[in-house]
């Protein structure tokens, strides 16, 4: 665990990093607002008109009904203000209408109100969401319990993420028949949400089996995949193939991906793997399409056929797959000085991948804008895309953005505080160059108080993460440490690797933000661009 005296870049940025959930499970992502549900009774006409896209007319029809206390109409007006459709966007007015609808026991209003309150930076408002959801859970434990589980796992209702309470609420929701909560439990025990100490492959398998038995086709494919390629202690080829067959019969074609993955990575039979990927590709399964493209591009078990591979990537890209767009962009932009046609074409594919929320693509697009290869450097666009990738948890983007803030570029002055925080966030994900950069700042006392003990620990960690140039810094700092400090530095390194929070010290200075736990890095890492 690293504690640094760097100010937060912004509440939004820190929140995005300090809650390392790999995928949203109930709470809406970003500002996403789904369409309201179908209404019955007096508000039906207003709701139908609104869902047809005539938002202003829907608001007009709902207003007099809302004044009479109609819960459906109140909910619709709340949604309109939250989304800015048909009226002004206003979180305050959305909350006002949702509260009134919630008082009339409107379930969706309770949940939308809770989403807004949970996103608040005020603890009091988040606690209001907790109370509303716990009350709703008495009648609707499935949905309310699922949302509460995620809120606790994200640390929105407690000072730190609380996996025990998350599991409690998900189990309660699951017992009420909520298949999504069953799947969340399966993923949780698989370690997808962090907390490796609570990982339990057998419990994960139990929950995947439960969801599959209840008819969830995605769970059928996931279960089959785990039985074929998961932890060796739980593998069962016969049962795995049976579940994948059921998934395919139910038109869940990701099962072909699981079969291909099993043949490729467990059985080491590349021809059999390609056959499964081809079947999935023919059924329209995008991931199988990408795997098949890889086989032809790399000549794995077949004669190398770049044209066929690229054609498959283009087909996947046309279907909107961001990874396919990114791979084509990489092909077109690979040259040091790509031709104009390739540059423009690559830019288009890269932009599509970035708009598809692929952090790697967002990072590369940001760098492309900053490079000036498009004719002139666009600092604003470059920083915007790097920031978006950084908010998505991309360690390379965090490091790149930190470097920009540390050095400063035209149109963007230096900001050591931002740089330090971003380096820390990237280092917490095991990023070697960021770890070294952070060690350098800490040693030199740039933006923070010089701390040779912490600097030695960080520099040593950077060496372990493949940064050979960190050796010189380790040696230099070591010459400044006395015996007592060397012992403290070793302890600091051990603490960083363990992920435990350091012991608190009496310090009259303003408390520094606590970054996520440092993860031990591999002995070697790939070179960073």
Give the ranges of each region predicted by the language model.
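Terminal, low-structured helical/coil segments at or just beyond the last alpha-helical repeat
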Residues: 27-33, 464-529
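Short helix-capping/linker turns of helical repeat alpha-solenoids
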Residues: 37, 67-70, 83-85, 104-107, ...
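Structural signature of tandem alpha-helical TPR/SEL1-like repeats
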Residues: 52-57, 88-97, 121-132, 159-169, ...
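N-terminal leader/linker segments that initiate helical-solenoid repeat arrays
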Residues: 21-68, 72-79, 111, 516-529
